[in-house]
Amino acid sequence: MADKKAQLIIEGSAPVELPVLSGTMGPDVVDVRGLTATGHFTFDPGFMSTASCESKITYIDGDKGVLLHRGYPIEQLAEKSDYLETCYLLLNGELPTAAQKEQFVGTIKNHTMVHEQLKTFFNGFRRDAHPMAVMCGVIGALSAFYHDSLDINNPKHREVSAHRLIAKMPTIAAMVYKYSKGEPMMYPRNDLNYAENFLHMMFNTPCETKPISPVLAKAMDRIFILHADHEQNASTSTVRLAGSSGANPFACIASGIAALWGPAHGGANEAVLRMLDEIGDVSNIDKFVEKAKDKNDPFKLMGFGHRVYKNFDPRAKVMKQTCDEVLQELGINDPQLELAMKLEEIARHDPYFVERNLYPNVDFYSGIILKAIGIPTSMFTVIFALARTVGWISHWQEMLSGPYKIGRPRQLYTGHTQRDFTALKDRG
């Protein structure tokens, strides 16, 4: 793995030889672990040039628009697989056989119920609390209800916790929504698949149970797949860092939810809807497109381009197809959705956006789909957290399965040098 060497020359010091590591794909990595012995650290705010870990789970090539889960292109998984099969893949490294899939799906279904006492836990939150605030609290509290699987050094405990989290996230997410509306919380149904069950718990009531549209269930399943993992982003890195301290899995996932809540990370599709609100009407599109082109104007078109993908977002094509299917299924006459489709058409053909590869991304289409299905904007990041849980827990599992150290980033200190304490009476 370390076939090459790099040499670091620091003025006044002897050259330092550092191993260069090569992965199966992607850039080579300079191993700086030996640098500490020389009395030097590296400085990389935001870790933009730092590989914090070795991983076999997800690979991204932003320049080529590639996203692979365990080697499989995301487009193929979204088209040919389903969410629980993708979960199995992320957790175990290989696609399941028919028997393995049946057993895994059955295990997840057996864990979808939550402890009845958890319902009373919700009463401690205001009904108008942001759903992500409630999610952070409830998921963190699961360790108080399921403390029979908290030994992180026991592979069986880790597996049970992973299954419980994947199974219970849709139930808890739907409970959060129902609590905010003052409606009765719905129990999961084992005769429904993962996405159908979520929509059932979100939109059905004890007095009226409607069949779930296969088109909407498929759309929801694809949203889950397309958000299942995205390598070492802020929330995944947070989960790994929390996990490195030996924290229990529920606490680690709660930390990931907290990081995802940040608008710079998990709020992108929510920002798309806010932008559409700001534009207001189809007649205003040209004006706002010009504002987006003006470098001196603070207005930005949300849901176009991507920080990682410099060419195109491989998830966006699948999401656009899904968006078209949902809108056709529902036949909604919504001015905001009409505005979104018009904006998409302009951005896909305007030379300014085409030349800069500012195409609609997965957040643009997923926001439209979720709104069309009837999910309120405040729940968008909750859906993201639900889908991303398998990615977080897979990275947590991977870290604990091998040698690891507690995360301890260093700093470039620029504060005061040592000084003596001054008594209060002597301070100017």
From Swiss-Prot:
Catalytic site positions: H265, H306, D363
PROSITE patterns: CITRATE_SYNTHASE (PS00480)
Regulation of protein activity: Allosterically inhibited by NADH.
UniProt keywords, alphabetically: Allosteric enzyme, Transferase, Tricarboxylic acid cycle
Transferase as UniProt keyword: yes
EC number: 2.3.3.16
GO cellular component terms given for this protein: cytoplasm
Pathway noted in the entry: Carbohydrate metabolism; tricarboxylic acid cycle; isocitrate from oxaloacetate: step 1/2
Pfam families in alphabetical order: Citrate_synt
One term of GO molecular function: citrate synthase activity
Annotated GO biological process: tricarboxylic acid cycle
Reactions catalysed: oxaloacetate + acetyl-CoA + H2O = citrate + CoA + H(+)
Record family assignment: Belongs to the citrate synthase family.
Note: Citrate synthase is found in nearly all cells capable of oxidative metabolism.
NCBIfam families: cit_synth_I (TIGR01798), PRK05614.1 (NF004126)
Assembly description: Homohexamer.
Name recorded for this polypeptide: Citrate synthase
The species this protein was found in: Pseudomonas aeruginosa (strain ATCC 15692 / DSM 22644 / CIP 104116 / JCM 14847 / LMG 12228 / 1C / PRS 101 / PAO1)
